[in-house]
Amino acid sequence: MVAELTALRDQIDEVDKALLNLLAKRLELVAEVGEVKSRFGLPIYVPEREASMLASRRAEAEALGVPPDLIEDVLRRVMRESYSSENDKGFKTLCPSLRPVVIVGGGGQMGRLFEKMLTLSGYQVRILEQHDWDRAADIVADAGMVIVSVPIHVTEQVIGKLPPLPKDCILVDLASVKNGPLQAMLVAHDGPVLGLHPMFGPDSGSLAKQVVVWCDGRKPEAYQWFLEQIQVWGARLHRISAVEHDQNMAFIQALRHFATFAYGLHLAEENVQLEQLLALSSPIYRLELAMVGRLFAQDPQLYADIIMSSERNLALIKRYYKRFGEAIELLEQGDKQAFIDSFRKVEHWFGDYAQRFQSESRVLLRQANDNRQ
């Protein structure tokens, strides 16, 4: 029996080696694709091509008796690696005549990411940090674009301190709140103004499929090429007004981050044994715990800035606190029917999204369980 099992495992090892060779060949082809895309200014990520390819492979897998979900999982991971590989090949310069780009706060993580992407796209990039302010006027004197990438709590102050910029210079900010910085830029500069909010962390290996929110400030025709450049990097663009952006971010960022902070604080005050929690956890709780831990591995100043960026955020968090208290009253009263009625009400509000989110989360939970050690 042992000999038979060993022989079968040896065959599996040979198949795995063949898979490795095929993956290496695929990455070589991806590198060639990256060079062609770079030459012609084509975006890294083309959703129609990806969807068509996955649909074809799923059908072919089913015909071979291979679970379609398996080949999709494998291909999605391979494509993620492919997008990163294409990144390294550089990108077409969509605005060759652009004068130097100055990134204010370019030493920070997001600033470094934009420096990398702009450099890969053939633009000259300069960095303006705190210790450079005595030379700021010289650094920005001939700038074609100035990108402000500094902590939220000093963004408007830094914008106000900028020396006069060339009239055609594009002034951009990357803050995760938009209305205040956008208004500050419109006051500080008479030329083109653009507000951006990258909806991802600076540790992303690629901008493929990442969302970049943009808010029009002034003279969109002057910065249209830059939006197209970001699309070439693989990102999805979403336009919204600065006011609407901040209203949505109150839910997406401020409330979510505060709830995560409060839960982490509660765990610490209760002094629970994390190792035991992990050992006993279901995939969904492990994933939730990972999201909580991830928050506390990052810069507390950033999250304090996001959560405390407006009175509206505080008002929203207070309403959440009030509803939390109302939910606790149901428990105190032991009113299961009221709980079920509230549950059904929320289920109805989610509508078809509930089933969609269940399907999406199922994939995430399987991946989380696969990574369990």
From Swiss-Prot:
Catalytic activity, reaction form: chorismate = prephenate; prephenate + NAD(+) = 3-(4-hydroxyphenyl)pyruvate + CO2 + NADH
Stretches assigned to the Chorismate mutase domain: 1-90
EC number: 5.4.99.5, 1.3.1.12
This protein's UniProt keywords: Amino-acid biosynthesis, Aromatic amino acid biosynthesis, Cytoplasm, Isomerase, Multifunctional enzyme, NAD, Oxidoreductase, Tyrosine biosynthesis
Main location, first listed in the record: cytoplasm
InterPro entries: 6-PGluconate_DH-like_C_sf, Chor_mut/prephenate_DH_T, Chorismate_II_sf, CM_dom_sf, CM_II_prokaryot, CM_T, NAD(P)-bd_dom_sf, PDH_C
GO cellular component: a single term: cytoplasm
Keyword NAD belongs to the record: yes
GO MF term list: chorismate mutase activity; NAD+ binding; prephenate dehydrogenase (NAD+) activity; prephenate dehydrogenase (NADP+) activity; protein homodimerization activity
BP GO terms, sorted: chorismate metabolic process; L-phenylalanine biosynthetic process; tyrosine biosynthetic process
Start and end residues of each Prephenate/arogenate dehydrogenase domain: 99-361
Disulphide bond pairs: none
A Pfam family: CM_2
Entry's family note: In the C-terminal section; belongs to the prephenate/arogenate dehydrogenase family.
The name this protein goes by in its record: T-protein
Organism: Escherichia coli (strain K12)
Classification lineage: Bacteria, Pseudomonadati, Pseudomonadota, Gammaproteobacteria, Enterobacterales
